[in-house]
Amino acid sequence: MALLRPHLHRFHSNTLRHSAYPSADAGGGLVVYPTYGRHRCSAIAIDAPSSLTGVTPIRWGYTSVQGFRDEMEDDIVIRSDAVDSFSYAAVFDGHAGSSSVKFLREELYKECVGALQAGSLLNGGDFAAIKEALIKAFESVDRNLLKWLEANGDEEDESGSTATVMIIRNDVSFIAHIGDSCAVLSRSGQIEELTDYHRPYGSSRAAIQEVKRVKEAGGWIVNGRICGDIAVSRAFGDIRFKTKKNDMLKKGVDEGRWSEKFVSRIEFKGDMVVATPDIFQVPLTSDVEFIILASDGLWDYMKSSDVVSYVRDQLRKHGNVQLACESLAQVALDRRSQDNISIIIADLGRTEWKNLPAQRQNVVVELVQAATTIGLVTVGIWMSSHLS
């Protein structure tokens, strides 16, 4: 098979503090990793050749911004594999250090590829088999990470990381997700949230299930944090909530966070933080425009509907997915995002943005909103006239 190199277009970023570099892997595909640190440099938009996806070229935009944090703990990976004919993209949001993220950037991809039998499992369309393979891959990587942290990490290394992974093959995408990053999709301008937040607080069904699971494992929730400590309930690493739970309890007593009497009543029946992912299959029908993966440094400061609308507006203006990605990160910074921000946008290349009528995607929504408003006003007038 002739290996095609993606076309690289460079655009200079004058505001965002980030760094990224591409490199070719042994299979002739493309690998993208951001570098750590607070830098100003060029960013790269990748037009993956159609042979990688079997449909139309995917145009990738990405940025990873340190923002106002003292350290950069996020990471992103994009791999377009010409041999195995699928694309892989991942956003990692680290915490308590970056060592877990650095381990995951290579190991998770390799484990996923192995579990998917170098992509051949994707050909069969057996979602149950694909789901099982990806779950095993995540859990295997977590076990290896915990061993690595114990063998090579500092004794005080309590780092961990969320992960939101997207695999695209032909006209279908698979999302594997743990943590509080998020993936959303634009379908003719209508937003679809593809993932749930794995957080031990909130009133959503996912949050309630996470709280229940943590408590059944013997944990407890204080102010939306497991054991008063961590605000995500699924993540890689976080060794103190897995293989070193008893050490965590002892440390808490030594630091005066809880008493020995309290600890004596604790009986762990499982891990409070787990790396078992949610797996979703997403058909990429002709009306799917783009998919966004991003860390919570974006979503905590912008509604997903606003994010999709903003990206569409940007693409209508100039059609450049990389500039749209960088501009989106800047908006989050302008809204005082205090976290690292990492964003990947996969424009599926199906939309002629310059020919797309402005606000076309909002017509139905606006009509519904207008009808609702008129209805509420009418009811209000009726009630006022009859109650007065």
UniProtKB/Swiss-Prot annotation:
Signal peptide: none
Entry keyword set: Chloroplast, Hydrolase, Magnesium, Manganese, Membrane, Metal-binding, Plastid, Protein phosphatase, Transmembrane, Transmembrane helix
Textual note on the cofactor: Binds 2 magnesium or manganese ions per subunit.
EC number: 3.1.3.16
Key word Transferase present: no
Top EC class for this record: hydrolase
Cystines in this chain: none
Needed co-factor(s): Mg(2+); Mn(2+)
Keyword flag Transmembrane helix: yes
SUPFAM superfamilies: PP2C-like
Sequence intervals crossing the membrane: 363-383
Pfam families: PP2C (PF00481)
A biological-process GO annotation: photosynthetic electron transport chain
Name of protein: Protein phosphatase 2C 57
Species annotation: Arabidopsis thaliana
